[in-house]
Amino acid sequence: MSDIFNSPQARSTISAAFGIKPTAGQDVEELLIPKVWVPPEDPLASPSRLAKFLRENGYKVLQPRSLPENEEYETDQILPDLAWMRQIEGAVLKPTLSLPIGDQEYFPKYYPTHRPSKEKPNAYPPDIALLKQMIYLFLQVPEANEGLKDEVTLLTQNIRDKAYGSGTYMGQATRLVAMKEVATGRNPNKDPLKLGYTFESIAQLLDITLPVGPPGEDDKPWVPLTRVPSRMLVLTGDVDGDFEVEDYLPKINLKSSSGLPYVGRTKGETIGEMIAISNQFLRELSTLLKQGAGTKGSNKKKLLSMLSDYWYLSCGLLFPKAERYDKSTWLTKTRNIWSAPSPTHLMISMITWPVMSNSPNNVLNIEGCPSLYKFNPFRGGLNRIVEWILAPEEPKALVYADNIYIVHSNTWYSIDLEKGEANCTRQHMQAAMYYILTRGWSDNGDPMFNQTWATFAMNIAPALVVDSSCLIMNLQIKTYGQGSGNAATFINNHLLSTLVLDQWNLMRQPRPDSEEFKSIEDKLGINFKIERSIDDIRGKLRQLVLLAQPGYLSGGVEPEQSSPTVELDLLGWSATYSKDLGIYVPVLDKERLFCSAAYPKGVENKSLKSKVGIEQAYKVVRYEALRLVGGWNYPLLNKACKNNAGAARRHLEAKGFPLDEFLAEWSELSEFGEAFEGFNIKLTVTSESLAELNKPVPPKPPNVNRPVNTGGLKAVSNALKTGRYRNEAGLSGLVLLATARSRLQDAVKAKAEAEKLHKSKPDDPDADWFERSETLSDLLEKADIASKVAHSALVETSDALEAVQSTSVYTPKYPEVKNPQTASNPVVGLHLPAKRATGVQAALLGAGTSRPMGMEAPTRSKNAVKMAKRRQRQKESRQQP
């Protein structure tokens, strides 16, 4: 194969097949195989230039906010609930935690890595070996058809026109400005309550488009959402003997960035700190709520002051998303990920993940449900969708996050929300949180959450991730819409798409390419665009049956030419037909498949990267995965991947590497690993393995808290419009019940203690007067406590009702900087005296710092002195007898 360009006959064949006409001094290989691409220099690679660009485009750059220095504290002091964890072999908690509670402060900075760059152009090279293998195989076919030629051409074009990498600062900044334009431009974002929706009416729409069930399972119920994170890890037994740990924390990618205040570290490296800060935030919030903060007509200054102390929980790192971008727009197109601070991610995940992970409800298992949540195209999934399309009833729709699919007039429409996250307002997220709390965290109508969690979900979390801020270089800048990648991104986007479908139903379902449909943008303040439309969709799908070619799933042979596909763009999947199975089966959209083949991502898992032999193992996984997701349908790509995977296998075997051990972790090595989650995949593609992968199986049974209206979204939309739906008990009522139950349980406990005391000290007529009076005194004391607790319960319950009835979102105001040169001042990153009451956390932890000059040290700010005095008073009160 290495000689394919050395043979005159081969060069002549290649030239003729691909229309290459080399001039003097050129050869065929140079013209067909793209050279190493050197990206253009980034014009915004400095804080001052980036700040200036943003300001010139009307983008808000914020006054820099400083962070307290991290200080070390013993883990057992900060997390006494989890002291047992450090006694377990392989425990993840370190002996000490590094917490942001120091007296000195600094301005944080974050400089993302952009690759490839002018300095490192070959950071993610294209797969030239695969291209040469395909050219070699092409030359072996005496009369190669146009389909085979197209495979080589498509791979070559992708290598030439695209590059895999993380873009540029200019691309990130351009994306920010585009997000702002969506949020504030021709169709500015609109709060749903101002459009006539209520949280309950939106929830009733989501009952159809995203039905959810309770967290946990029948045989293992989930604990209520009433605890701090450290109490979600429950030890039963003795760590020195037999024990079991019940883990009620959400699943989190511990290899991802930890965010502020731990720039450059992963969540796994700061798991203790993540739990500790979340604990403290929720406990402080609970304390302030009990004091009346946030209730109707009360002073909110304490709550806003606390949120100001924790400002970093609303500031994500602006992380460039690595993708396969067009070289022509390399400078200006980079997608951003809002890398949330790990405590923020943990707390919001504690609300969303237990419910959503246990709600496998979609169009496959619930009649009338248009959701594609947890949809998998394999095992007959795509065939069910094609059958749905072929059914004569229409118009009809499917929805997943910011993707909408509509069949209308025998035409298939794939619609995307335009920069979906930018369309989200804080009220949209409030509605999403309302839905998760009232539909998911509910046990037969009773709430499984308390006032603290309801207030966090409804009144605080939306401000942390929507219209918040981000850090890039040393600039703190505003974000418009929700930060992409936060723990509520999916449900927020799904809610937006649901509102679009609701308006479509109320308009009597016009064609998506009509002006009437387009007017939904203005009405809702939600932008969208038609990504793909296919006319005569039923005819084209039926043609696949007639045109299916012999192949792995049609005759059990290697394909000699590809079967035709219909590119539905259904979450990236197309449809083709299997004669052997008699069903439609999924293949990755052709453009996406060949783009993935052109540019490998490489080993992204840092813990696997250091393993000897991992690069060869990655090749095995990559090539076989490409075949599984659709490469099996394209003769040259299939054969080239098969040959290259075989060569990598033989290399590992010759070196004595444990291939089975590597392949056991194949989902960590493949970008398509999620598509095969839960499947027992053998990474050797054969007719049998492909048939097993695509053989239809019954869908998972649904798990819902309330029955879904089989009339579908249209029936619910019309019923809401005409008022036939009753507005059921809202969140405030559930919080009232949750808080009352919690507080009145305290009263019941106090009363029980009094009764227990009475039983333990009977009124013995022979007892002396002193003993009888002591008994009476104890009983009166306990009864008085019970009475006070009961009264307090009623008062706090009333406050809770008023607090959550409010639709306001609590957030401090952060000033904008007018001069970009000030915002990008190089002093950022230096340490300076504390300027705000960040000691609130230190005070409640009982952890303070001291200076040689004491509390009145001149380098301390007024707030730092105030917090030091508070800690001193607390210390003195603890020392009193």
UniProtKB/Swiss-Prot annotation:
GO function term, MF aspect, one: GTP binding
Recorded catalytic activity of this chain's protein: RNA(n) + a ribonucleoside 5'-triphosphate = RNA(n+1) + diphosphate
Paired cysteines (S-S): none
EC number: 2.7.7.48
GO CC terms: virion component
InterPro entries documented for this protein: Avibirnavurs_RdRp_C_sf, Birnavirus_RdRp_C, Birnavirus_RdRp_palm, Birnavirus_RdRp_palm_sf, Birnavirus_RdRp_thumb, Birnavirus_RdRp_thumb_sf, DNA/RNA_pol_sf
Domain (RdRp catalytic) ranges: 398-598
EC top class named in words: transferase
Reported modifications of this chain: May exist in multiple phosphorylated forms.
Source species, domain of life: Viruses
An individual GO BP term: viral genome replication
Residues bound to GTP: G259, L260, P261, Y262, V263, G264, R265, T266
Function of the protein: RNA-dependent RNA polymerase which is found both free and covalently attached to the genomic RNA. May also contain guanylyl and methyl transferase activities.
Quaternary structure and partners: Interacts with VP3 in the cytoplasm.
The name this protein goes by in its record: RNA-directed RNA polymerase
Organism from which the protein derives: Avian infectious bursal disease virus (IBDV)
Origin organism lineage: Viruses, Riboviria, Orthornavirae, Birnaviridae, Avibirnavirus
Gene designation per UniProt: VP1
